[in-house]
């Protein structure tokens, strides 16, 4: 509202929930989450957890919708104890992973809304003697550089930030 009041041109990176009337560019993260559920299902996983960021952020809301769409498409039931939100840091990801893996029916795969949270799973898996990629599958979203140095490297949907920046600049000009 302030930018509009001052007639300052702007664009948004990401959609808003209130459908603000302004130019925006977004990458459809919800499609990635749906595809991730489908991929995990194709590998034999039926109990797939979702670790989300803060649900008040629109990207987190959309990624949750993609996860739920994937479950529904495959005939899998949502289990409330397999969906955690408010996970913003690697330490939060560690705590969320530990909670999920201590459930009476733990997931065999975990989908993370952000790479930062997913990186926390590596410590927990090591502590519990689980091999990521063999005994626990992980897919995440963002493509942060640190993911390439995890062992094994983090499976992630990499965001082309250069392309996003170019699109935003084109919208602004």
Residue ranges and their predicted role:
Residues 56, 63, 116-118:
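Alpha-helix capping/helix-boundary segments
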Residues 2, 6, 62-74, 99, ...:
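Alpha-helical structural signal in soluble globular domains
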Residues 25-50, 65, 69, 90-99, ...:
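Hydrophobic alpha-helical segments within soluble ligand-binding/sensing domains
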Residues 96-173:
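Flexible loop/turn connectors
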Residues 20, 68-94:
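Short beta-strand elements in bilobed, periplasmic/extracellular small-molecule ligand-binding domains
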Residues 1-35, 116, 142-154:
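Flexible loop/hinge segments that line or gate small-molecule binding clefts
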């Amino acid at each position: 509202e302030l930018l509009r009041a001052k007639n300052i041109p702007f664009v948004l990176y990401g959609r808003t929930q209130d459908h603000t009337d302004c130019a925006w560019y977004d990458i459809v993260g919800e499609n990635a989450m749906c595809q991730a559920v489908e991929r995990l299902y194709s590998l034999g996983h039926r109990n797939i957890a979702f670790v989300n960021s803060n649900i008040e952020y629109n990207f987190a809301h959309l990624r949750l919708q993609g996860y739920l769409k994937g479950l529904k498409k495959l005939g899998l039931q949502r289990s409330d104890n397999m969906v955690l939100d408010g996970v913003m840091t690697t330490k939060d990801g560690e705590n969320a992973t530990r909670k999920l893996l201590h459930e009476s029916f733990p997931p065999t795969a975990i989908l993370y809304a952000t790479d930062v949270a997913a990186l926390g799973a590596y410590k927990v898996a090591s502590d519990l003697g689980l091999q990521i990629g063999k005994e626990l599958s992980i897919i995440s979203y963002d493509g942060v550089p640190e993911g390439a140095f995890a062992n094994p490297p983090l499976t992630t949907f990499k965001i082309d930030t250069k392309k996003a920046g170019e699109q935003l600049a084109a919208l602004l000009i």
